[in-house]
């Protein structure tokens, strides 16, 4: 955030209106390069992101945009430019990456001023993915049904640009965005989310998607506030929630006449809404009839107000006690935990059956093994195989890669109720590492294990125990139950590539 404040040379009063000149500044592309480089370190291997953003290519791009009538790159031109010597697709990726940095500046400044004004303490902890699970443990055990919503994508690119017009007043920037979207992204590739992310800059795509989702979530929050005045203060530090609450006064005037006759359908103070990736969950204590009304409300809202094609099959009603929700790399469900209590009163004794609801979080072992299979760590049955592409590296580098992946998965899935699935994932990675080393040295697995002895095995199995012993030095050595319990971390801000199997 300090970098933005140093680099911005525009007038404070006009900062939100004129962002287009920043596209000609080299430091914008440097910030985009640093963001992509740091993000690539989170995943398994570096994809060579830094090779695309050399200073020479950036200067050539700025000169080309600065020259008159040279910004527009015709679709009839050859993909290889003889003068610049680089593909036009590379320039489009650089423009989208730079625009992603620019368009976030007004929102980042507003978020910074909001957090300073409210004096929100430890706001970074609330950005952790694991911070939502303690909330689910407290709330979901009292709820009955949940809507598993698959959010539809806009059918036209102009819808995304129009959604951004409310926040970015710079017409030139919007024209540049519209040009980039239409020139380098056809309609078929945008409807399919996986293809669109591969063509567009992922950071820009997520920003446009979140800005569009903010529109219909504003209406939902208006209905939510009409039925209940409860408001979560912990979510106030999130960027999207700031604009949700800011639009409530406007929505009361515009949408009250449209929804006032139907508000009685949604009178429920126990409604919890969570959006993540391309999905959303609406959990409530309502009956199945009222949840079915919520289902068709979402479909009608998308079709008639936001022109997004949606079907009722994209919204599923799940009973929490019978079905599991595939949520952020966990299978979450409400499990009934029966307990028997014996009560003694004078000479009479009573046996009381007490059943309590508890949130159960398990690892989706089948999908995770599928991700490991695609990454060539095992076959489709979960049997470990060697990683031939890593066999050319040194032994220490190979071991460090496997240990780092194992540590990241263990760190993310530390909140699992059952550790057996996590042990199986460790087993696959451990023997995949052994087979890779044996393949490199042209030896058998058994002979190579004898050479490594037990020190190699301890690197895979004692990582969490070492961490827990540092956090809880007194409790850990007296009880092993802490290691078998669920631990939620507040430093996880992204999902590992193997966990994000969708």
From Swiss-Prot:
A Gene Ontology term for the protein's cellular component: chloroplast
Q: List the disulfide bonds.
A: none
**Pfam families annotated for this entry?**
Intron_maturas2, MatK_N
Tell me where on the tree of life, at the top rank, the source sits: Eukaryota
GO biological process terms, semicolon-separated: mRNA processing; RNA splicing; tRNA processing
Q: Which compartment or compartments is the protein found in?
A: Plastid, Chloroplast
A GO molecular function assigned to this protein is: RNA binding
Question: Secretion signal: which residues?
Answer: none
Q: What does this chain do?
A: Usually encoded in the trnK tRNA gene intron. Probably assists in splicing its own and other chloroplast group II introns.
* Entry's family note: Belongs to the intron maturase 2 family. MatK subfamily.
Query: What is the name of this protein?
Result: Maturase K
């Amino acid at each position: 955030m300090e970098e933005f404040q140093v680099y911005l040379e525009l007038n404070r009063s006009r900062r939100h209106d004129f962002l287009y000149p920043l596209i000609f500044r080299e430091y914008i592309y440097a910030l985009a390069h640093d963001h992509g480089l740091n993000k690539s370190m989170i995943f398994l291997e570096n994809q060579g992101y830094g090779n695309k953003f050399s200073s020479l290519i950036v200067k050539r791009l700025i000169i080309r945009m600065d020259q008159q009538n040279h910004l527009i790159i015709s679709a009839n031109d050859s993909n290889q430019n003889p003068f610049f010597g680089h593909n036009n697709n590379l320039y489009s990726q650089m423009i989208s990456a730079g625009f992603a940095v620019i368009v976030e500046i007004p929102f980042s400044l507003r978020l910074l001023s909001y957090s300073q004004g409210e004096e929100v303490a430890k706001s970074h902890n609330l950005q952790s993915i694991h911070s939502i699970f303690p909330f689910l443990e407290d709330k979901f055990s009292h709820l009955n049904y949940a809507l598993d919503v698959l959010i539809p994508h806009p059918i036209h690119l102009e819808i995304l640009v129009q959604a951004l017009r409310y926040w970015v007043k710079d017409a030139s920037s919007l024209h540049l965005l519209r040009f980039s979207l239409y020139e380098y992204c056809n309609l078929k590739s945008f409807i399919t989310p996986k293809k669109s992310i591969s063509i567009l800059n992922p950071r820009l795509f997520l920003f446009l998607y979140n800005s569009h989702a903010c529109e219909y979530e504003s209406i939902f929050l208006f209905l939510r506030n009409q039925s209940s005045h409860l408001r979560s203060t912990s979510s106030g530090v999130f960027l999207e929630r700031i604009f949700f609450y800011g639009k409530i006064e406007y929505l009361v005037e515009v949408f009250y006449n449209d929804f006032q006759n139907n508000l009685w359908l949604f009178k429920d103070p126990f409604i919890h809404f969570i959006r993540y990736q391309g999905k959303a969950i609406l959990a409530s204590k309502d009956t199945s009839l009222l949840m079915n009304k919520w289902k068709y409300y979402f479909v009608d809202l998308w079709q008639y107000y936001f022109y997004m094609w949606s079907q009722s099959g994209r919204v599923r009603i799940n009973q929490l006690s019978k079905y599991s929700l595939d949520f952020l790399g966990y299978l979450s469900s409400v499990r009934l935990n029966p307990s028997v209590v014996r009560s003694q009163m004078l000479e009479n004794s009573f046996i009381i059956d007490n059943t309590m609801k508890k949130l159960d979080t398990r690892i989706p072992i089948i999908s995770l093994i599928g991700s490991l299979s695609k990454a060539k760590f095992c076959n489709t049955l979960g049997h470990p195989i060697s990683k031939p592409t890593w066999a050319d590296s040194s032994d220490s580098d190979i071991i460090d890669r496997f240990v780092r992946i194992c540590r990241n998965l263990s760190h993310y899935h530390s909140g699992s109720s059952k550790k057996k699935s996590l042990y199986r994932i460790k087993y696959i990675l451990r023997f995949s590492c052994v087979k890779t080393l044996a393949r490199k040295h042209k030896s058998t697995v058994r002979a190579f294990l004898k050479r490594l002895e037990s020190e190699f095995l301890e690197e895979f199995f004692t990582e969490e125990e070492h961490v827990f012993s540092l956090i809880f030095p007194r409790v850990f050595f007296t009880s092993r139950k802490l290691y078998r319990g669920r631990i939620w971390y507040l430093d996880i801000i992204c999902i590992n590539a193997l966990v994000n199997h969708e």
